[in-house]
């Protein structure tokens, strides 16, 4: 197991992140002290700054959450300028070298790397939920031949809520964990089916004898061969790519999912909303534009 490290900047003196902010309201000549905790002030503290008792109080205006945190999180630390990325305090270099994606997924969800027994149980639980209900498969087959894969993906993830109505009980920890397991297992299947549909290819059922990423490659690219053997270099590269993208702080899709989930909507509906946000050209859609450009180039000799 890796060794926990403090995020860059955690060694700063306590006085640099705690204390108070003094605000002088020139409208009333009143002075206010706003507590600072970990370099953050509460936006609700501004509500106390009023002209009189009937005043609503000050509000902060921050389009696009450019300087607003909606939650306290210990999942990911990023310092882009210094090239630092950590999940739960573990350097990304260490995780990419020594761990697999499902191990990192466990780390992100539970806060610690799993023991071998915990990892085996975790992988087994996910592996045996990779198949989709045949009715959901039929739903995906009903889309137009030229349907955009992201549109199919969003709709199919949302449809999962109709297959697992118990997911609405979001207050039960065991139920929540069950849906997490299902989503990690079924999202690659839905993604692969959406891709194959866009290519006019038949869907490939999951192969649970393969690794998480090996199975995904099989569902994406298996053709007429009796047994698909994933390219080991590509399989490992994809696993590392999944690790790098395992969490990206409070981005657009994360904020969308948290907003939907705050109403206690089921996890499938929440994730479908997040995926819809991801499809936008200013978010994950930018990756699609890059892939389109690479396909148009066609060969490295043309670069």
Outline where the language-model segments fall.
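Hydrophobic alpha-helical bundle cores within soluble ligand-binding/oligomerization subdomains
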Residues: 3-303
